[in-house]
């Protein structure tokens, strides 16, 4: 287990958005969060790196490796908890600098050789190096959408996170680019724990080891993906998976 929540409640003003969420996130596995828009998936995801702190009141416990996130320095926390967003958000810098910027900021690089090796390694991990090796000094905005999203994943990997959060990482991409990202995530999960929000149930079924279904801020069902999709226990889950609501 890499992380867990215990009796997690979250309020936007007087409106409660999450209700007593208890969940364990397993080490080196992909956990998918599914449910209709506004059900609390992304809100829950952002509790792990404290992105809700300024806009919400949070009760309960969120732990990563047994440590309460609210007692951690937020910069140190976000080094250990990477995030990839729905829209690719590359820095307006070169491809090379997109990878090297954060490790240098965190003092992780001792010399130029280390820096270059890290950039190559991260780009290779996301299958991008061969595509960009001759244009590392080019502005990252010149890449295609799918390439930009892989660069964002490589950038997140550069600071060696223990947990990677993905908020609908393929929803803005074409089917071919989405497939490339899905295969990449499955490969990365051998050495990295991930939580992924997705509106694509088939994607969750293809990629995730565990799946959680949220409805109106409540965790309705959570379990291993094969059992979750083939033999759901809760009536609301059955209805959602069959398209009866959501």
Curated annotation (Swiss-Prot):
Recorded hits in SUPFAM superfamilies, A to Z, give: P-loop containing nucleoside triphosphate hydrolases
The record lists the catalysed reaction(s) as: phosphate(out) + ATP + H2O = ADP + 2 phosphate(in) + H(+)
Which ranges carry the ABC transporter domain? 3-241
Q: Name one GO biological process term.
A: phosphate ion transmembrane transport
Q: Which branch of life, at top level?
A: Bacteria
Q: Name one GO cellular component term.
A: plasma membrane
Entry keywords, A to Z: ATP-binding, Cell inner membrane, Cell membrane, Membrane, Nucleotide-binding, Phosphate transport, Translocase, Transport
What GO MF annotations does this protein's record show?
Answer: ATP binding; ATP hydrolysis activity; ATPase-coupled phosphate ion transmembrane transporter activity
Give the main EC class.
translocase
Q: How does it sit in the membrane?
A: Peripheral membrane protein
> Sorted alphabetically, which Pfam families does this protein's record hold?
ABC_tran
Q: What is its EC number?
A: 7.3.2.1
Tell me where in or outside the cell this protein is found. Cell inner membrane
- Keyword Secreted belongs to the record: no
Which residues does the record give as ATP binding sites? 35-42
Q: Which family does it belong to?
A: Belongs to the ABC transporter superfamily. Phosphate importer (TC 3.A.1.7) family.
On assembly, the entry states: The complex is composed of two ATP-binding proteins (PstB), two transmembrane proteins (PstC and PstA) and a solute-binding protein (PstS).
Outline what the protein does: Part of the ABC transporter complex PstSACB involved in phosphate import. Responsible for energy coupling to the transport system.
Q: What is this protein called?
A: Phosphate import ATP-binding protein PstB
Please report the organism this UniProt entry assigns to the protein.
Campylobacter jejuni (strain RM1221)
């Amino acid at each position: 287990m890499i992380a867990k929540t215990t009796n997690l409640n979250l309020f936007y003003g007087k409106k409660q958005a999450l209700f007593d969420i208890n969940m364990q996130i397993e080490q080196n596995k992909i956990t998918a969060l599914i449910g209709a828009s506004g059900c609390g998936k992304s809100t829950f995801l952002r509790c792990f790196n404290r992105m809700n702190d300024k806009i919400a009141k949070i009760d309960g416990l969120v732990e990563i490796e047994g440590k309460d996130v609210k007692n951690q320095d937020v910069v140190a926390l976000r080094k250990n908890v990477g995030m990839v967003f729905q829209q690719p958000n590359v820095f307006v810098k070169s491809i090379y600098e997109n990878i090297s910027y954060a490790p240098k900021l965190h003092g992780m690089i001792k010399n130029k050789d280390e820096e270059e090796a890290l950039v190559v390694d991260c780009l290779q991990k996301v299958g991008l190096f061969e595509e960009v090796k001759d244009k590392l000094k080019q502005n990252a905005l010149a890449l295609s959408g799918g390439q930009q999203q892989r660069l964002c994943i490589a950038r997140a990997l550069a600071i060696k996170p223990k947990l990677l959060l993905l908020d609908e990482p393929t929803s803005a991409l074409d089917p071919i680019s989405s497939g490339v990202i899905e295969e990449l995530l499955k490969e990365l999960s051998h050495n990295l724990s991930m939580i992924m929000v997705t509106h694509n149930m088939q994607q969750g079924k293809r990629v995730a080891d565990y799946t959680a279904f949220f409805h109106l801020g409540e965790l309705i069902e959570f379990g291993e993906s094969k059992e979750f999709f083939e033999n759901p226990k809760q009536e609301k889950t059955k209805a959602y998976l069959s398209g009866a609501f959501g």
